Amino acid sequence: MQWEVVIGLEIHTQLATQSKIFSGSATTFGSEPNTQASLVDLGMPGVLPVLNQEAVRMACMFGLAIDAEIGKRNVFARKNYFYPDLPKGYQISQMDLPIVGKGHLDIALEDGTIKRIGVTRAHLEEDAGKSLHEDFSGSTGIDLNRAGTPLLEIVSEPDMRSAKEAVAYVKAIHALVRYLGICDGNMAEGSLRCDCNVSIRPKGQTEFGTRCEIKNVNSFRFIERAINSEIQRQIDLIEDGGKVVQETRLYDPNKDETRSMRSKEEANDYRYFPDPDLLPVVIEDSFLDTIRAGLPELPPQKVERFQSQYGLSAYDANVLASSREQADYFEEVVKIGGDAKLAANWVMVELGSLLNKLGVEIDQAPVSAAQLGGMLLRIRDNTISGKIAKTVFEAMAAGEGDADSIIDSKGLKQVTDTGAIDKMLDEMLAANAEQVEQYRAADEAKRGKMFGFFVGQAMKASKGKANPGQVNQLLKAKLEG
């Protein structure tokens, strides 16, 4: 039987506010446990929550960016459940009247096509604290620094049909919230976490199968692996005569499998009711107009502009616009270096390889946009060849200065003097007289392969400094003359 996969995602995005959603406590990551928890965060009697307007503004920014309906009247609700790191015994969230309603986000698939993914809603809520198991023998520690950190939970429609589509959607959300500046997107620190709802159904069936939720997956790679593992588990289970049970599961990356965590709760299990300590929040049109006017250029618009303005392919434009920092870096290089396609190649390939090797983001790149742009100028004016440029790039990455100083100090300037190249070629051909005779006696097909040998010998003789274009032109004339 052929199976169709149905995937919906819930993405928990920590908003980059300076203080928590209902208290004035700081939200700095990595502070000593329980040093950023106020009486409000601790759920002490008699204290009252006060809504952080910046969290509301950031949620509205996201809603406008995905062309969503913004809830003009917002009500906060208590989501009741017991967990050791939830001091109040309930979480303040939104149920019936979320701040962001239906919207959509377009994702680029591997074949270059664009698919629209529906966003059901996005609502504001407070994060819980954190249980610490590894540092305590036979017991669990509770860190409430995270309790009360503002979250925007983004709920998608079940529109994805493969793990790769799901990853593309999460990457698009990740890029968007970073462009907007509402989340740092640091998945390792838990700033962006994903719950994956996965089900299967026979191909052609319209009714959904029983879904399982994989909780708190925190990397693109693990999202893909977790979903694929769960898909295979459900297929094997049904084909062996079993039945999928609706439940919450965890992904174990070491065993590459999901395991049962608990039965899946429904909304009525949490006994939602309006929080009596928080008045409804009314969002006025003037507030939204101000936010709309301040929105930055978003990834889809930037991709379109990169193609029209710089003549880049759709693939290159999507890669370069995948983060705001990378897009800004690329444009700064183009501003100095002039050639957009050359800049795109160096940013994506050479710089990308360097950043992967160092394990850092582009805002920590050891080669600045000004340095790279300056080096590309020297390629364009034939001061250095593309091959020598790699040596210059490595030296810049090692902190040896800008392109011009490295070229001068290492004597890397390209030889463009026709007389000097002509003399060098004569000496090289004289030293390889036998190969010259073989070349001249060969047919056209063999000559093509043999020509590369002479080019290699010429570049070796010049220590890579001879202008490759001039070498090719003069060499061809000499061999066929």
From Swiss-Prot:
GO biological process, one term: glutaminyl-tRNAGln biosynthesis via transamidation
One Pfam family per UniProt: GatB_Yqey
GO molecular function: asparaginyl-tRNA synthase (glutamine-hydrolyzing) activity; ATP binding; glutaminyl-tRNA synthase (glutamine-hydrolyzing) activity
Superkingdom field: Bacteria
Keywords per UniProt: ATP-binding, Ligase, Nucleotide-binding, Protein biosynthesis
Functional summary from the UniProt entry: Allows the formation of correctly charged Asn-tRNA(Asn) or Gln-tRNA(Gln) through the transamidation of misacylated Asp-tRNA(Asn) or Glu-tRNA(Gln) in organisms which lack either or both of asparaginyl-tRNA or glutaminyl-tRNA synthetases. The reaction takes place in the presence of glutamine and ATP through an activated phospho-Asp-tRNA(Asn) or phospho-Glu-tRNA(Gln).
Similarity comment: family membership: Belongs to the GatB/GatE family. GatB subfamily.
PANTHER family per UniProt: GLUTAMYL-TRNA GLN AMIDOTRANSFERASE SUBUNIT B MITOCHONDRIAL AND PROKARYOTIC PET112-RELATED, GLUTAMYL-TRNA(GLN) AMIDOTRANSFERASE SUBUNIT B, MITOCHONDRIAL
UniProt-recorded name of the protein: Aspartyl/glutamyl-tRNA(Asn/Gln) amidotransferase subunit B
Organism annotation: Pseudomonas putida (strain GB-1)
